[in-house]
Swiss-Prot record:
GO molecular function: rRNA binding; structural constituent of ribosome
Name of this protein: Small ribosomal subunit protein uS4
Subunit structure: Part of the 30S ribosomal subunit. Contacts protein S5. The interaction surface between S4 and S5 is involved in control of translational fidelity.
Gene3D superfamilies, sorted: RNA-binding S4 domain
GO biological process: ribosomal small subunit biogenesis; translation
SUPFAM superfamilies per the UniProt record, alphabetical: Alpha-L RNA-binding motif
Keyword RNA-binding carried by entry: yes
Transmembrane segments: none
CDD domains linked: S4 (cd00165)
Species in which this protein is naturally found: Thermococcus gammatolerans (strain DSM 15229 / JCM 11827 / EJ3)
Lineage start: Archaea, Methanobacteriati, Methanobacteriota, Thermococci, Thermococcales
GO CC terms in record: small ribosomal subunit
Length: 180
């Protein structure tokens, strides 16, 4: 059978702990996207660094295998909704951490109007009231694929699935008040 793989950290901590500009930027992002802690932000920053590192390596590489890997990277980023279909490898280098944070399930639930606030969106997800593609997802940091974006709804067994739920009525009124 073999031993299970060793669990590794999925994030890198900053190289210096007290750089004021970075701390201010992290505080703003943490508040804007209602992240639980900086570790969530660092996880997405590390993911972005990995995409950018691969893109830089592939820009310098030549050959058939490099071309295959270029296409795979661009397809992956397109599926995640981070890049358009006609994007070039240089576009990967211009991605920001906010682009990645915009693809989180928590952010998309809020933007779709299923929750009044981004914090409420997080709570709905963790409590199992949101499903993606018919599957309940309990991780607010789940990166939603482009084809799954339209399938984000309230879970069938959730009380929020009923149109007459009091909280849904409040959310609908808030939507109508924002449009007027």
């Amino acid at each position: 059978m073999g031993d299970p793989k060793r669990q590794r950290k999925k994030y890198e901590t900053p190289s210096h702990p007290w750089i004021k500009e970075r701390l201010d930027r992290e505080r703003v992002l943490k508040r804007k996207y209602a992240l639980k802690n900086k570790k969530e932000l660092w996880r997405h920053e590390t993911q972005l660094k990995e995409f950018r590192r691969r893109a830089r390596r592939l820009l310098a590489a030549r050959g058939k295998q490099a071309e295959i890997e270029r296409q795979q990277l661009l397809q992956r980023l397109h599926r995640l909704g981070l890049l358009p279909a006609d994007a070039a490898l240089d576009d990967v280098l211009s991605l920001t951490v906010e682009d990645v944070l915009e693809r989180r399930l928590q952010t998309l639930v809020y933007k779709k109007g299923l929750a009044r606030t981004i914090r409420q969106a997080r709570q709905l997800i963790v409590h199992g009231h949101i499903e993606v593609n018919g599957q309940i997802i309990r991780s607010p940091g789940y990166l939603v694929l482009r084809e799954e974006e339209d399938t984000i709804t309230y879970a069938k067994n959730s009380p929020f699935a009923k149109e007459s739920h009091p909280e849904r009525m409040v959310i609908e009124q808030a939507k109508q008040g924002g449009e007027a």
